[in-house]
Amino acid sequence: MMKILIIEDTPNKKTAIEEVIGALFKGTANHYGVTWAEDLNSAQRFLYTDQFDLVIFDMYLPDTKNIGLERDCSSELITVFSQSKNYNSEAIALTQFEISEVDNIQLFNKAGITLVNYDESNAWKTALELKLNRVAQKIKCDFLIFCALTKERAAFSDTEAVLGDTQNISGLDCQEIKIGDHYGFIVKPSEMGLVSMAIASSKAIELFQPKIVAMSGICAGVHGESNYLDIIVGKVCWEYQTGKWKDGEFKQEPMQASLDSNLKIDLEQSKDDIGLITQVRNNLFESELATMKIRIAPISSGSAVIADSTMMERIGSQHRKMAGLEMEMYSLYEAAAQSLCRPLYFGAKAVVDMGDSSKGDKFHDIGCLTSARYVSIMLKRQLEKLQ
């Protein structure tokens, strides 16, 4: 969701600014929230404590609302803006003075704040619309979910999340989703596998700048470490195909990606959360769900579909506690870990087969649903912490 801070205490001017913003985004998929600061103290507090996509400045404010007279606060505001986490945000100052009359115009220029005369003409509206359009093109969101299959994404329709329209955004197959008060997208790559997921997740994370990313779906289990319809959360994840062939023998060299330590604690605690497990199983009656467990365990990724018990044993030898095998999670973990915005990340997939010759699709639909429910619940909890 686009976040806008408006520093303004004049009622008529506030109304005019709101009308421009509302008219520009009416009927579009852009969600936005406005925070108002009507005095210097609250403006400084918001700039220091929160991050905004656009900051709209007024130069003259009282130090405290309803106490004292307005004064020129531009120097203080620019200093705080430049030192805060918003220093790189889009910014515009609307002043009723002629630009030529502003003494400290160089301060605005150095801080990257566009200074515009607020008058009866429409010039200031055009300038504000340009800023809003520039911010809208960045399309930031709170979270992203990645699903390799259409049925994995469709399963979110039976969760507490609210699904919206599908969109083609910069070549990405996206579907709008809202969890609680937070907006995001479910992104589906063009194909299954590590390569397509690496491309889609890297591109989406840099484009949308989310706070947290997740993956849901289905996977193969490992005998002795997981059972049908268990949900496997990737504690560590690696690609089992990396290594070197030498003298007819493949020597493995798996590179691991792991979870953030604080997030891992929350995920570990979820496996004993009876209320959460009840929500995941609600109105589902497969007998295997009676013994379903949430396992925070090692999971391996590879680009091939495995339906061979011998190959499963060979891959499983890379980690004695490996509980699952799937085709995309390692790509997401690495894309998130190496991105510029460094979001939190986790993946959760339900066991629907054991990667042997009996592989089938009996549990696909229910596996997609239980993993989607778990992911939506955990995302809601984490997003509330990240506000």
Curated annotation (Swiss-Prot):
Residues 3-123 form the Response regulatory domain. GO terms for molecular function: adenosylhomocysteine nucleosidase activity; methylthioadenosine nucleosidase activity. It comes from the Bacteria. Keywords: Antiviral defense, Hydrolase, Phosphoprotein, Two-component regulatory system. It catalyses: ATP + H2O = D-ribose 5-triphosphate + adenine; dATP + H2O = 2-deoxyribose 5-triphosphate + adenine. The purine nucleoside phosphorylase (PNP) domain is probably activated upon phosphorylation by DtcA. Residues 140-387 are annotated as: Purine nucleoside phosphorylase domain. The modification 4-aspartylphosphate is found at residue 58. Probably phosphorylated by DtcA. One of its GO terms (biological process) is phosphorelay signal transduction system. Its EC number is 3.5.99.-. One of its GO terms (cellular component) is cytosol. Probable response protein of the two-component regulatory system Detocs that confers resistance to bacteriophage. When the system (DtcA-DtcB-DtcC) is expressed in a susceptible E.coli (strain MG1655) it confers resistance to bacteriophages T2, T4, T5, T6 and SECphi27. Detocs inhibits T5 infection leading to growth arrest but not complete cell lysis, during SECphi27 infection leads to cell lysis. Has 2 domains, an N-terminal response regulatory domain and a C-terminal purine nucleoside phosphorylase (PNP) domain; the PNP domain has ATP nucleosidase activity. Expression of the C-terminal domain alone is highly toxic in E.coli. This is Detocs response regulatory ATP nucleosidase DtcC. It comes from Vibrio alginolyticus. The gene is dtcC.
